[in-house]
Amino acid sequence: VADLRADVRLTEQTEWDRFDPASPEGVLAGRRREHLARAPRSGTLPVAVPTETGSGSRRPSSTQEVFGRVLVGLSRHEQVGRYLVTTAPDVATSTNLAGFINRTGVFAPQPRRAWNVDPVLSWAEGPEGQHLELGISEMNLFLLLGQLGLAWDISDQPLLPVGTVYDPFVLRGLDALVYSVYSGARFIVAGTPSGVTLAPEGGAHQSTITASVGLELPGLTLLEPAYGTALDWLLCDALSRIATGPTPTTTAVPAESGAYYLRLSTRPIDQAPFEQARARLSDAVLRRQVLSGAYRLLDAWTAFPALRAAQDGGTAVPVVHLAASGPVLPEVLQAAHELAEDGVAGHVVDVTSLDRLYAAWQRTLRQGVRTATVPSVPGALRVAFGPRAPVVTVHDASSHAMAWLGSALGVPAVSLGVDAFGQSGTVGDLYRAHDLEPGAIVNAAMAALGLAG
């Protein structure tokens, strides 16, 4: 290396100097520099995404159904609608994108004749379309979402990309998903339907470990709401964060980088419990807690006055927290009522984002480790759970995805979930097989209380 340096008449002090601008090599390098130079590109989309579309319903509805309605509502928004792009690997209608497709059309370089005979679906293909339909290739889905999510950097055109896929098949495209998230792409993917709640279709279509993937993959934020309005808030908030771009953070845990994973369901559930929590907490407080990752759906002291009266009268009423995500909330609420009949106060916590709760917990742990101080309980956990009490976690996913909550709260925990391949049957059949029914939840609560002594 020293000989080469001497041959080209350089020294250690000058070997990285630029060429003489007047020399042939300097002129060539200057031309290439000018050709390749570009102004810094902003990753910010100059639109204000609404905080909600009002697509939630008071009647029983599923999160997949509301997801489709929220996208239709956003497509009507003058500023936001033109930047929305959807894509799916041959499952557009079965993941509830039909309404959006009817409004925006399907992209094709040239107009194509529509051969579709579905009377409720307008499959109009042309250059103005905003939906990209793929064949059955989940790998291509995540590769495309990755490129759409980097369009602001590649072509100076920020977009709001949304993809849908059957939840178990998230794993088919996992390598491309990891690469896209690692590259900093900003997008939303909805895995729907999910879990054994998709009961009739059997184990091949029932996802169990996807929640763990969403929780553990850096740069991807898992969201799993149970109620329509909560989904509306979370989806609009995610799109707003994508439009704004990553913001700097000084905390021990990195800021969300802009990739979001919605785990949804086709199970219609009663929306009344959410509306009751809304009346108890107010819209502003409830929305803040939903976006933070968890809120108290049912407060046992409020819902069961006899328990409060007994507690105030000096009787020690056992207390347990029932934490759950997604479509199992009706069973958890029923278990809380059965526990109340046995004199146990069961507070029901709806966990809308395990990811955000876990990140908050890890942030406090790491700050404690780095400063040699005792970590505190994160605010989001403290607000949703309140004073310490044993916890039962219930999840239509692997039981280990929520099992860490006991450690975070510093209490005994019993975790219920799906730790075996599913079978075909009714939702009730599958919930019984995996201990997700109210009776099993009650027994788990008693076990947790027993562990607490």
Label every model-predicted segment.
Residues 1-453, ...:
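Thiamine diphosphate
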